Amino acid sequence: MFKKNTKHLQPALISAASELPEKQLKLLKGSWAQSFYHEFFCRIDEEIFEILYSSEPSRPNVPVNVLMGLEVLKAGFGWSDEELYENYCFNLQVRYALGLDRLGDGDFTIRTLYYFRERLSKYYLESGVNLLEQAFEQVTDAQIRDLQVRTGMQRMDSTQIASNIVDASRLQLLVEAIQRVHRILSESDQERLSSSFEPYLKGTAGHYTYRVKGKEAVQEHLAQVGSVIYHLLAELKDAYAAEAAYQVLARIFAEHFKLVEDSVYPKENRELASGSLQSVDDLEASYRTKGNAQYKGYVANVTETCDPDNDLQLITKVQVAPNNVDDSQLLAEALPNLQERTDLDTLITDGGFGGEASDTALDGQDVKLIQTAIRGPKPDSHSFHLADFEVLFDPQDTPTNITCPYGQMVPITPGRTTGLQARFDPEICAACPFHLEGRCQAQPQKRDRRYLLAFTPKQIRAAQRRKDFLEHQDHGQNLRAAVESTVRSVKHPFRAGKLSVRGQFRVTCLMIASAIHVNVRRICRFLTDQNFFSTFFAFFKSVFQPQALVWA
């Protein structure tokens, strides 16, 4: 049964904190724990989580704000569950941050936290709603409102993160899948298919692959394993098709092998899709090559405020997706939520966020995308780019007119087959110095003497992005750069960017919890600085104001 936690709003007269000497109590109230309690813990709307609990009269739940606070502390400090529970039981700062006055209050076993995670995960699978993300947005919106953080300008950046999976070779992954299927079989089926399984049960999958030396040997074993998997799938389909291990084996076979006239052939490495299975323990992790590095896991996308007039910047959005998802798709998915919750009008990103998905999402929106770099080859500096032309739009955001660098304005019309076109006066173009220098893309046609410039709506959007990029460069202020340190702050508790959990949902929860902790620490520093300056100016006023009266 759900019950809100209001006990912490009435502190006990005698508590662990109140028994501290005055000096230590002052340190406690000036630490992160005070900010965590007031700026996060007290802001949590527990009713968001009411749907996880029974409506029938029954035993009340462990306070949701305590459980959520523990998730944030685990992510923020990079603790294991054991370390988290020890700190919950004995660390005065942690208990103070969670509104617990006495060391014996709020006792529960660590399994309660596991059940809470299970409820969150089950609800997400059923509804597609991440309640932890909802709570993060609710708390952050309240912080933004109360601390008067401007949200018109925001910046966004993505980073690669890994879940807690083994970096397995292709052969090792296949053998591990076979071993997992063997474990779910009945004794009779294990005995019936013992000849098929026997070569792959002598030790771990890693032991099996260690004995295979050379590329040719690996290819031979891949072919043998493929034939075995094909045979097992046929033999076990009727009895085990609903089992998760069988479904994983079927997926691996489809991704790694091709069937030609009942003969099994392993696919070449280059034929494998980036979304192919990377681990039997994490079915959503994907593969990506970025630069000279290879990654297995997920991509996290972080958005934060960046108005130069803000004394405090806060993270407003955290997304996690398989790492083969393009940055422009992440921007497109985040945009409606950011517009609904904030006053977003300018979004600053790197070059990776420009693309068809983001262009489509930004069409007709009052949000300006500024990229600090542009995808693709650098254009010829001698020739004019479409960004050098001025395009006018109607209220429906449809391009209507275009003005060339020489100042000639003409209407934009549909092309004969696809795209758009503009036709310029041949007499003006013939006398244009830019045309004489060979810098203009518009050229005369055989049947029509007018100079033709053909382009597509996609090219217009790309040109507008380039124009915004060049204007941003002229300002000499790179507002995007600092978001990289924010990403680093969110990833810092996780060694080498590898999280202690598996699966997209759990990875998302841990990244959101870490972002909450980053926000709390920023608020703590902000409030500390404010208190310092207010104390300093009060002291300055008390010292010099009497002197001014004497001199007067």
Protein language model features and the residues they cover:
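Short amphipathic helix-turn modules centered on a small-residue break
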Residues: I48-S54, Y96-L103
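DNA-recognition alpha helix
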Residues: L84-A97, V139-T140
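Basic, low-complexity segments
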Residues: M1-E56
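Anion-binding and metal-coordination hotspots
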Residues: E83, R102, G106, Y114-A552
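Double-stranded DNA-binding cores of transcription factors and transposases
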Residues: V64-N65
